[in-house]
Amino acid sequence: MTLRMPLKSLLVLGLLASASVLAADTAKAPAAPVPLLWKVSDKDNAVYLLGSFHLLRPGDYPLSPEVEAAFADAERLMFELAPEEMQSPAMPQMMLQAALRTDGSTLQQELDAATWRRLEGWAGKNGMPVVSFNNFEPWFVGLTISIVEMTRQGLDPKLGLDNHFMDKAKAAGKPTAGLERAQEQIGVLDGMEATEQRQFIVEALDQAEKGSAETERLHQAWRRGDAEGLWSGMAADMKRQYPRLYRRINVERNDAWVPRIQQ
């Protein structure tokens, strides 16, 4: 595929995973990660595509020379969200506002008894009263579970690959842009049908219960640039168990991004 773009671009795209990454053994410094990096080019233009984890740890840096070389060669960077939106203090408030239930019902009334019990158990393990989730939509609670699991194991969004390259682009004076707006990204989650939202919270609980071995495997696959390992350990399960949710989060968003990349 030839992309007609006037500039060499680096696209930093996140891997959608409701999984956490373990802190590595610090006794031996690991080799620099070689994440998912592709180059698409013709005689005039080039696009680098880089797969990202949104939360990382200090041991994941520095990146491999190939990634740093792609950044140096790129004249502009594109992210899922533009830096001014992703790093805006208004972003969490926008998400919180969208997540509030407005029909007078509670989350407990919406979830089946088995899922509520699982949520109650997870909340208890993390020192949270489960009733604190009652005023929110399932998608927001599922996202909260994923983020808590990540940060509980030492991950830091400030160290995520997106923020890393946003900061580097700003320091280097390179233009940046987003493939979608914050409202669009929130709308993907908030616009899910009730069945999809309940699946989202179950998927988050499933990942939380799989524990450290699964998340370490995914992290190592990312560090190796192992696309097949990430697919089989993450996307394939979602596609098989929750096909409509998979289509909404992965397929439809990717389809919407392609014309913006080609511009």
Residue map of PLM features:
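N-terminal secretory signal peptides that target proteins for export/translocation
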Residues: 1-5
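Boundary at the C-terminal end of the N-terminal hydrophobic targeting segment
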Residues: 21-25, 31
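Alpha-helical scaffolding within the catalytic cores
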Residues: 32-35, 257-259
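Structured, acidic catalytic/metal-binding patches in enzyme active sites
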Residues: 34-249
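A cross-kingdom marker for long, charged
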Residues: 244-263
